[in-house]
Amino acid sequence: MSEIGVAVLGVGLMGADHVARIASRISGARVAVVNDQVTEKAERLAATITGCRAIADPLDAIADRDVDAVVLATPGPTHEKQLLACLEHRKPVLCEKPLTTDVETSLEVVRREAELGVRLIQVGFMRRFDDEYRALKALIDGGELGNPLVLHCVHRNPVVPGHFDSAMTVRDSLVHEVDVTRFLFDEEIVSIQIVKPTPNSLAREGLFDPQIAILRTASGRHVDVELFVTTGVAYEVRTELVAEKGSVIIGLDVGLVRKSAPGTWGGTITPSFKERFGQAYDTEIQRWVDAVRSGGTTGIYTDGPTAWDGYAATAVCEAGVQALQSGQPVAVSMVDRVSIPGA
């Protein structure tokens, strides 16, 4: 396949960014169709792109003959129906998180894809494509740091929308650290606890902020995550790995820094996720497009996190919301992957 036609469903902040990315920086793809629940927004955007059309119904957009692949940047509650439509039409899809909003529907999506015998769903956990996270993963896999022991994470936002509640801190923010943990350690998370320290007096009433998440992996590794979404400062995402033979920090806006390495650093903090992970998004979409284009030959239409990864993240976050409410550690409940051939 030479150039693929992509439908972008949902053209809010994330979707519009993907439209601009595909239209200007990604090779081998064009934006063929856009869709949004605000029809006028999609129509205005389509008018700025040669050969692009706005289609009001998302299922019609998926089925359209000019569409070879789909990017889902729609609200989470719509994902199940749209993902199943993509599977029905056998169209590769890159779905922004979450896969779906609950464990049962996420598992159903995993099963439906597995029944087809072809991998069509990729989930948009973009940190796996970030140069710093990839360098950290390579260090772990290379073994020079010895056995990884502990992961310390920081996830801060300057501000969040008015509808953002305490559970969304788990589902929308922590979900990235959940996937990072599984990506770096190649194992599942088996329990989660949410600790609520002294609250930020500047956060609106009813929003517990900050929160501290404590994760435990199947092999017993400890992961702690500071989640602080009303700092009023900037967008900050940092990760420190502590291993048997040293430690590594990423997210200092200067690239990977090893504790023993000489040098100094300084500069500004990235204002939002678009700047911090711009390279990761570009790499993610380009690799996905390349996989879709070669899928007819290879039989593989994805190059990144799978539907199973989306299901696992949903399962951990669902347990996390329970832990937020109870204040106690909660076991993560998942089916055994081997019980679903092809998952």
UniProtKB/Swiss-Prot annotation:
It catalyses: myo-inositol + NAD(+) = scyllo-inosose + NADH + H(+). GO terms for biological process: inositol catabolic process. The keyword rRNA-binding does not apply. Its EC number is 1.1.1.18. InterPro entries: Gfo-Idh-MocA_inositol_DH, Gfo/Idh/MocA-like_OxRdtase_C, Gfo/Idh/MocA-like_OxRdtase_N, MI/DCI_dehydrogenase, NAD(P)-bd_dom_sf. It comes from the Bacteria. Homotetramer. Belongs to the Gfo/Idh/MocA family. This is Inositol 2-dehydrogenase 1.
